[in-house]
Amino acid sequence: MDAEIFFNPYLHTKRSRRDWRAEPAADNKESFLQIVPRGVLYDGATGLIKTQCELSPRMFFEDREYVLDPVMVWPGLDIAADGEAVPPCDFVFHTFDQVVSLVFAEGRGRARRWRQHISPAGNVIRLFGATALGTPVCVNVFGQKSYFYCENRPGEDLRDVIHDLADASRSPGPLSASPSRRAPLVAVRLRPGDIPHLYRVSFNNWSMARKVGALMVQEGRRAYEIGVDPLARFLIDRKIPSFGWLRVGRFSRRCNGQTSTAVIELDCQVGDVVAGQPLPNWPPYRCLSFDIECMSASGAFPQAEVLDDIVIQISCVCFVVGGSGAHRFTFAEKHLFTIGSCAPVEDVWVYTFPSEYEMLLGFFIFFNRFSPDFLTGYNINGFDIKYLLHRMCRVYQKDAGRFTKLRRGGRFFVNSPDGSGDAFGGRSGVIKVFCAGTVVLDMYPVCSAKTSAPNYKLDTMAERYLGQRKEDLSYKEIPVAFLGGEEGRARVGKYCVQDGARQGPLNVIAYHYEAAASPNLARIPLRRVIFDGQQIRIYTCILEECSARGMVLPSLPSSPPSSGGDGAGLEGGDGGTAGRRKKKRSGSAPDGEDEDDPEGGDEGENGECRENGLEKEGSQGSASGNVGYQGATVLAPECGYHHNPILVFDFASLYPSIIMSNNLCYSTLLVDGSPPVPDEDVLEVVVGEATRYRFVREHVRRSLLAELLVRWLKQRKLVRDAMKACGDEKQRMFMDKQQLALKVTCNAFYGFTGVAAPMLPCLPIAASITKIGRDMLLATSAYMERHCNDVEFLVSEVGVPREAVDRDALRVKIVYGDTDSVFVGFRGIGREVLVKVAGKLAAAVTRDLFRDPVRLEFEKMFVSLMMICKKRYIGKVYGENKLCMKGVDLVRRHACAFVRSIVSEVVDVIFHDEAVSEGAMRLSEMSFEELRRQGVPVGFFPVIRRLCDARDDLFLDRVPVAQLVLSSVLSQDASRYKQKNLPHLAVYRSLVERGEELPGVGDRIEYVLTCPDESKKRAPNYEVAEDPAHVREAKIPIHAEKYFDQIVKAVTNVLLPVFPKDMPRRERFFAYVLPIRTYLPEVFLRMSKEDRECGAYLARESGLGMNSFIVYGEDTCGSRVGEGPGRGEGLGVGGGEGTRPPRKNGHARLVSGCLYGSRPFNKKDRFVTLHIE
């Protein structure tokens, strides 16, 4: 450890080392804080070396020294595609990202042609993209005005009003106010005609326009569309796709004074850009996937705010998305940035740096030189990007914005949920990343939204989508390996690179193609599709339609103006900053689990509120919270097990079809002050007891929303038809993403009108949609029960063969109804017949009850259905072997493997064994009194038997310890927990006492529940938790009773609908029916033949049978004591010596009061006697 193994030129200068806390030297040289892990100088050493360095930052690659400079040629990157010819006019390129900059005319190099648009300051829209060959392009669009509409009071000079509202120290700059003829969206509130005294106010400066508009609304003036930024105006007014091909007619190419890193940079005016051909193909875009590794000086989970919690390695993987395979740049695929010397890593370019700052600087220079169009990774929004930006911008006080595609005015920042306001139309609670000219695609929120999995660790997703498992390296091993020497750093580097290399899910899920299908429909940038919800999409769609119709949208006092979420900023302004709140990541995955209790409470039964046979789905409210309306309808479910055909019908595009068929819209709503309309021209919707909403009919005024929906649904149908005829797999994928974008946007209209804190709220529309949908569901249910119980209707209208109907058994009943679906149970008609005629039945309902385009469709048929409660059911679909589950987790996510397997087996046998299915249905139809008299149906015995077998396996120690392991995350240092009585903390303390290797913060601590002393039978989990390795080594018996209790609770939670509805304490069902078995220590099992015969004699003489005298276990020969061939065939007791309890009507007799589990054994007794009352 004495020999220095890594030469650091900054630590070997002849000058004395300066104190790192000292102020930088007062000369022209720029110094920086150098933080170096001591272990890169001395193998195995811990701690950090800090010094203030005045030399130039540098890196080492393949025994060569490089001085780090933002304009350096990076080794391994050859992407400066040169020589692509630029035509004198009609330049065609593909755009993927747009940024709005506020530019000042004082800047040098401004041609007079462009200066007029930015004097003294003006908007410039940067269109980033690429040519067909992949050459980077940036087009600077000048002349886009920021404007809104407002009503001027008679006798006022609008210009004077605006100057008064503007800051006294700042002029609003050039502005124009011209009369405009526009109608309001809610036009029926006024007399026919345009808004009187309406003016369009235009500014060069977007920030000033936003400020003045907001102040007008605050003063009570009527203003319209004040929150629409210049980029949205450009895309909507010019019909420009935000992700697609564009053509620039006239332009001038910048050869000097470029503001971007693009190879081709053009200047043009707003009228020079037009939409190109709507081709689905992309040019080759550069994508960068990266991952970081950090090291905490305290051993806790690294935090960027802590000076000593440094970044030690960064991996980058470069690849191309889109294109046909031909492009004009080449580059190495895998790169590793590391502090200290590093052994070679196969197929990886390794760059070594003397300190953290130099490594960060090297990474950002590499990022700038590679200039990725897409930045991806796993949980990079919540951790990696935030960490890098905080270290670079806050710790080292360097501007990260200058490494983006904009040389001046670039911004690179993270907007955390606790930030100071989201952009207009943004989603709260979403971490947003802005990087000028680069679209960020974090695959963690994508995978968590599109995948149902026990956890969303990268390893789990990679195994799911790629069939790969990574070489795992725990957090506690990373610092040791990194500080151990070159080979250790290479091992950490290989681990880091493999995380960055797993961009496979991006290609498998193809989310980048899905996201790219939405911008053109909504006229919003791709980044807003990714980070902002549906609100902004619907708003811009309505805005575009209103603009085409000569209408304006109102601005609400509570609506915040756009905060520049699309990149409005100052050229030459300060750079981006990192997010203010750190989102912790547990372990090596961002799933954020907290301490888990494997014995958590059971889910409740049916606690929903019911009213007139309906269950309230919930309520929506206005932003103020004082007005609400009842949410979607849920018909009260027939809870239980249904082993008869259940037809499921649903409405196609329910909410869009309601809007279209009933002509609902802002523009058709009659409000106070509306002109009188004849009753026959009005649709009246009664909501509640006294609230009435009125909308004019289609022949009076056509709904704007309806026309949008009709257009999009027709377009979606054309796309779906084209998919069927398309033979190109890639084109089919493009089309599929396009039709999905149309579907999602159509379905979002309902939420747009009624969601809390909306952009354009209209409670009457949302409440009317809900009420009409509720009436449709009730009408469908009544129609089904009234007509389908009539044989003649089934034969004549639906086409059911007369001989296929069992008149005596025919019974049709609504089992469940939920928003847009109806579950109809049929008896007396075979499954095959029902499947054939279900479509005709749906058509008959549509024809008799609804107007076009409302359409009821047959979705599927359940052969068996276990209805647990609303929105929770399990069913077996006709023609499929896989079970359909909704709202049901068979077991808690953190249950052990053995519990999960038993619950799955029980559910499978109920749905796939015909006899068990019949038994379950019979049991669900029984009353508690019938159950007491007749006992559990014979068909249900396999379930009882499987639970008994599971209990045997636990008590007889036949379950491997690995299947009984539970785990919880150590989310912080063990000493910082306020609650000490947690199982995983108890295991941690045990490891400390035994001097074993301790887990680190973020690791999952595994534990097993062990058998306590006889005096602590009811000991809590933290008293019996133990490390699995120690349990195996010391052969400690497990706590079989606790594990079996978990099984019983989990099975009961799932099978609750099967138990008699009037049974008291249904959750105790298995306590009543499972036979008692007492498991004896081996010393008591060595019984002679005479002992056994004596027990049999006592059983016969008592008249209770051997079932009441249960001594259960295994003797030395492996045979079971107290058990005969009839084991498990009885109810409430285990069979013994071939005897079975008396039966009546094919059922075993139910014996009340039996208990399950173990009990203390009395040494004086040969048998444990169960007295039955």
Curated annotation (Swiss-Prot):
Compartments where found: Host nucleus
Biased composition (Acidic residues): 591-606
Gene3D superfamilies: DNA polymerase family B, C-terminal domain, DNA Polymerase, chain B, domain 1, Helix hairpin bin, Palm domain of DNA polymerase, Ribonuclease H-like superfamily/Ribonuclease H
Biased composition (Gly residues): 564-578, 1123-1138
Listed EC numbers: 2.7.7.7
PROSITE patterns: DNA_POLYMERASE_B
InterPro entries linked to this entry: DNA-dir_DNA_pol_B (IPR006172), DNA-dir_DNA_pol_B_CS (IPR017964), DNA-dir_DNA_pol_B_exonuc (IPR006133), DNA-dir_DNA_pol_B_multi_dom (IPR006134), DNA/RNA_pol_sf (IPR043502), DNA_pol_B_thumb (IPR042087), DNA_pol_palm_dom_sf (IPR023211), DNA_pol_type-B (IPR050240)
Pfam families on file: DNA_pol_B, DNA_pol_B_exo1
GO annotations of cellular component type: host cell nucleus
Biased composition (Basic and acidic residues): 607-618
GO molecular function: DNA binding; DNA-directed DNA polymerase activity; nucleotide binding
Region entry Disordered, spans: 554-625, 1123-1144
Keywords: DNA replication, DNA-binding, DNA-directed DNA polymerase, Host nucleus, Nucleotidyltransferase, Transferase, Viral DNA replication
Superkingdom, taxonomy of origin: Viruses
Family matches, as SMART domains: POLBc
Catalytic activity, as annotated: DNA(n) + a 2'-deoxyribonucleoside 5'-triphosphate = DNA(n+1) + diphosphate
Keyword Ribosomal protein found: no
Top EC class, one word: transferase
A GO BP annotation: viral DNA genome replication
Family assignment from sequence similarity: Belongs to the DNA polymerase type-B family.
Full protein name: DNA polymerase catalytic subunit
Gene: UL54
